[in-house]
Amino acid sequence: MHTTTNFLDEDTCNYILSELTGVSCAWYYTPSVGSVDGDDGFMFGHIFYDHRGKCSDFYDVIVKPIIYKAGFTEQHLLRAKANLYTNQGKAIEHDYHIDNPVQGNLYERPAGVILYNLTTNNGYTEMKTGEKFYSNRNEAIFFDQSIEHRSVTQTDTDLRINININYEYPNSPSTE
């Protein structure tokens, strides 16, 4: 588990944020955050890539710079999505979960998570092991997909936006 500050160049970070907050980007309401049928709050999401392949016109300009900077290619990609949390006047702790679109099960092969923050605020991602990673603009958090984690909403800004990318480790048997 580690973080990289100033993960992308400032122009790319600004461009990604402007695209995600512009009028052309559709955000979709998600009635629960940590589990499919939980009552742990809500968020908005935008899927770039999942088991169906590319799902968004923003894929090339948002996902590719992140995965290439992280050192892997599209063949390693499992899922990529953006998360948008609104300020609800108090910190909402969502349910712990592992990232996987298939009912919370681990991916079949070793996989990692990149959580790329586009905004700075007092919202954070908390690992079940106790570590907290506050939302710092242009910072990427890297961790193993098997680690349970949760998001906690911010109270000091209107929006918290991050990009969540799940990927097979490049040296995984299926990607060699």
Q: Residue locations for each model-derived region?
A:
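Non-heme Fe(II)/2-oxoglutarate
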Residues: M1-H76
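Charged, amphipathic alpha-helical segments and their flanking helix caps
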Residues: H2, F7, F142, N164-N166, ...
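A short glycine-rich, His/Asp/Glu-containing loop-to-beta-strand
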Residues: F72-I92
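A short beta-strand-loop-beta hairpin characteristic of the jelly-roll/cupin
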Residues: K90-Y96, P101-Q103, R109-A111, N117-N136
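Short beta-strand His + acidic residue motifs that chelate non-heme Fe in jelly-roll/DSBH
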Residues: D95-Y96, T125, E148-D156
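A short hydrophobic beta-strand segment most commonly corresponding to one strand
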Residues: V113-Y116, T157-P173
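Conserved metal-binding segment of the jelly-roll/cupin
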Residues: F133-H149
